[in-house]
Amino acid sequence: TRRDWGHSKDYVKGIWMILQYKKPEDFVLSTGKNYSIEDFIKKVFKILDLNWKNFVTTNNKNFLRPSEVRSLQGDSSKARKLLNWKPEYDLDALCNDMLLNDLKLYGMTLEQAKKIAKKLSKK
């Protein structure tokens, strides 16, 4: 399964730009790139210095939705052309920001999470 993962900061900026446009129009905001969920997981686990294969099962049909869309990728060419909008955050930045935000919710730093992750990987 592949998705067009984008950062909320890019989308909020794009929405603001759409609202400033001279007339009502339909726009698609997307990165125009799609990545597998495995790509996403690898990046997050890399930040934590973990081997994702020790924690994640892939290709198990029990975890697939019956009507799963295999690939979703947006075409933001209209927004890029008329609004001069483009995403500023790549998948690495998205993964990093999401992880750091979740850690903050738990009152943890990245270094604390890495220590816990290291202990878990030894089990």
Go through each PLM region and give its residues.
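C-terminal substrate-binding subdomain of Rossmann-fold SDR/epimerase-dehydratase oxidoreductases
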Residues: 1-123
